[in-house]
Amino acid sequence: MTELPDNTRWQLWIVALGFFMQSLDTTIVNTALPSMAKSLGESPLHMHMVVVSYVLTVAVMLPASGWLADKIGVRNIFFAAIVLFTLGSLFCALSGTLNQLVLARVLQGVGGAMMVPVGRLTVMKIVPRAQYMAAMTFVTLPGQIGPLLGPALGGVLVEYASWHWIFLINIPVGIVGAMATFMLMPNYTIETRRFDLPGFLLLAIGMAVLTLALDGSKSMGISPWTLAGLAAGGAAAILLYLLHAKKNSGALFSLRLFCTPTFSLGLLGSFAGRIGSGMLPFMTPVFLQIGLGFSPFHAGLMMIPMVLGSMGMKRIVVQIVNRFGYRRVLVATTLGLALVSLLFMSVALLGWYYLLPLVLLLQGMVNSARFSSMNTLTLKDLPDTLASSGNSLLSMIMQLSMSIGVTIAGMLLGMFGQQHIGIDSSATHHVFMYTWLCMAVIIALPAIIFARVPNDTQQNMVISRRKRSL
């Protein structure tokens, strides 16, 4: 890093700033949801669309971000990403209704979807290959600090100012980042193949419509027949994409990816697994505030052990997988996460609050081990010609499944919380207890998929990639 020219180091700082903004936003909002609900006159049990709208937009836009950067230039797209994210933040802060807030989050999601992948692409283009790992470590470090800082910062801003400030703090940072990008970042472009617009539209429509159909009756008052039509339309769009990809060699995601058994199993397991684990960052702060009466600040502080556990486990997960194998690790962590989730609910409802940080630390560790194992299992056996496409598809599936998870969590809260409930009341406890029990079942189900993974205790993605590059 020290050998790099000054202008390159400044460019890395710009990318790191974008990573920080995006990662901070993914965690800072959850703590503020109950306060947003009160301000907007909505039930706190129906605020999940604020999260879903952002994550789903990121999932939809991810496949286009790399192509746009290659075609239009990394500087232009990164600049546009920061501007859109900052404008979205401003409109979020100015929102007076839930629908306005959801639309503003969609705009924010368009910027967020381009920020991280285009940032990675920028690092690849401006840094020599020998220093790429050090540069990526540098720019992703703020992305690890964001989730650690987000819940507590969100709690402080909500408790001592207002929820609007969780979005307003992005504006000065975004202005500085946009100006620095325009002035300092080179605009690399390369020749690209034709973008698969029909495939992109089919996938985007399918993902958006299916997610909407999951919870349209509760959040938007859509009739059951209309929901059934939406579900059928979304499924048809996905099937049409599969037919399109089968006939087109230039499809967005080649069906040849699924000729690799570990990729197919890993992708299916990642999709199902992240539906369950995607509920936890949304449900935990809402449960602590609405279910137990915690202040926003204290609820935010409670999330820090979970992030610390996740960061700590990343250092040893490779050794664990090499020792026990993917199948044992994935089955054990999947069932373990379900048990830890039930333990968290039990400890909280029993009033043993002093144990909550320890349980959340354990939850973060188990979840991190499962995430890392799912990612490497999915990609480890792909040929080099398909590795980039497989990684893009995995990233899209990760975001999609998390949006579905939050949608299902909101649907469960709405289903069990039909009557008006008060903070830290017996009725509220029952609503969250039933919701958490259903969540534990959903979290545990992917163990059935992971039980089919080959028991390859000696194979590891890092090892195979190194061998392949020699």
Swiss-Prot record:
One Pfam family of this chain: MFS_1
Residue ranges annotated as Periplasmic topological domain: 1-11, 70-76, 125-137, 186-196, 243-262, 307-341, 417-430
Q: Its GO CC terms?
A: plasma membrane
- Look up the coiled coil feature and give its residue ranges: none
Q: Which residues lie on this side of the membrane: Cytoplasmic?
A: 33-48, 98-101, 159-164, 218-221, 284-285, 363-395, 452-470
Q: What is its main location?
A: membrane
List, in alphabetical order, the Gene Ontology terms for molecular function in this entry: transmembrane transporter activity
* Compartments (UniProt record): Cell inner membrane
Gene3D superfamilies xrefs? MFS general substrate transporter like domains, Multidrug resistance protein D
- How the protein sits in the membrane? Multi-pass membrane protein
Transmembrane annotation, as ranges: 12-32, 49-69, 77-97, 102-124, 138-158, 165-185, 197-217, 222-242, 263-283, 286-306, 342-362, 396-416, 431-451
SUPFAM superfamilies, alphabetized: MFS general substrate transporter (SSF103473)
Keywords from UniProt, A to Z, are:
Cell inner membrane, Cell membrane, Membrane, Transmembrane, Transmembrane helix, Transport
- Return the similarity comment: Belongs to the major facilitator superfamily. TCR/Tet family.
| NCBIfam families noted in UniProt | PRK10504.1
Name the chain's protein: Putative multidrug resistance protein MdtD
Give the source species: Salmonella paratyphi B (strain ATCC BAA-1250 / SPB7)
Lineage of the native species? Bacteria, Pseudomonadati, Pseudomonadota, Gammaproteobacteria, Enterobacterales
